[in-house]
Amino acid sequence: LEKLLSSSSSSSGSSSPLDALGGDHSVNKRDTFDHSCKGIYDRELFRKLDRVCEDCYNVFREPKVATECKSNCFVNKRFNVCVADLRHDVSRFLKMANSALS
């Protein structure tokens, strides 16, 4: 913080206060997902599984629905109910969820 404050008050000509912090500020893309998901990171797979939970939330409009649906990396009773309620192929989505977990 001191480095940031001193750089903004000095006449060093830094283009941005963030430049003073250094360049190592990468964000791990996997951090946007549940850390219980131990399988191979597959953005498309997670998008499909997450979409089931978001659609289920939109049907029931209860905040806990989306959270419960995503718990344990989509391997839970709520996810199964959501898949069935949305009239998706249950066995297909269960295989997808299990592959995200292992």
Curated annotation (Swiss-Prot):
<dbReference type="InterPro" id="IPR000346">
    <property type="entry name" value="Hyperglycemic1"/>
</dbReference>
<feature type="disulfide bond">
    <location>
        <begin position="56"/>
        <end position="82"/>
    </location>
</feature>
<dbReference type="InterPro" id="IPR035957">
    <property type="entry name" value="Crust_neurohorm_sf"/>
</dbReference>
<feature type="disulfide bond">
    <location>
        <begin position="37"/>
        <end position="73"/>
    </location>
</feature>
<comment type="similarity">
    <text>Belongs to the arthropod CHH/MIH/GIH/VIH hormone family.</text>
</comment>
<dbReference type="GO" id="GO:0007218">
    <property type="term" value="P:neuropeptide signaling pathway"/>
</dbReference>
<keyword id="KW-1015">Disulfide bond</keyword>
<feature type="compositionally biased region" description="Low complexity">
    <location>
        <begin position="1"/>
        <end position="16"/>
    </location>
</feature>
<keyword id="KW-0372">Hormone</keyword>
<dbReference type="InterPro" id="IPR018251">
    <property type="entry name" value="Crust_neurhormone_CS"/>
</dbReference>
<protein>
    <recommendedName>
        <fullName>Molt-inhibiting hormone-like</fullName>
    </recommendedName>
</protein>
<feature type="signal peptide">
    <location>
        <begin position="1"/>
        <end position="30"/>
    </location>
</feature>
<feature type="disulfide bond">
    <location>
        <begin position="53"/>
        <end position="69"/>
    </location>
</feature>
<dbReference type="InterPro" id="IPR001166">
    <property type="entry name" value="Hyperglycemic"/>
</dbReference>
<keyword id="KW-0964">Secreted</keyword>
<keyword id="KW-0527">Neuropeptide</keyword>
<comment type="function">
    <text>Inhibits Y-organs where molting hormone (ecdysteroid) is secreted. A molting cycle is initiated when MIH secretion diminishes or stops.</text>
</comment>
<dbReference type="GO" id="GO:0007623">
    <property type="term" value="P:circadian rhythm"/>
</dbReference>
<dbReference type="GO" id="GO:0005576">
    <property type="term" value="C:extracellular region"/>
</dbReference>
<dbReference type="InterPro" id="IPR031098">
    <property type="entry name" value="Crust_neurohorm"/>
</dbReference>
<keyword id="KW-0732">Signal</keyword>
<feature type="region of interest" description="Disordered">
    <location>
        <begin position="1"/>
        <end position="33"/>
    </location>
</feature>
<dbReference type="GO" id="GO:0005184">
    <property type="term" value="F:neuropeptide hormone activity"/>
</dbReference>
<dbReference type="Pfam" id="PF01147">
    <property type="entry name" value="Crust_neurohorm"/>
</dbReference>
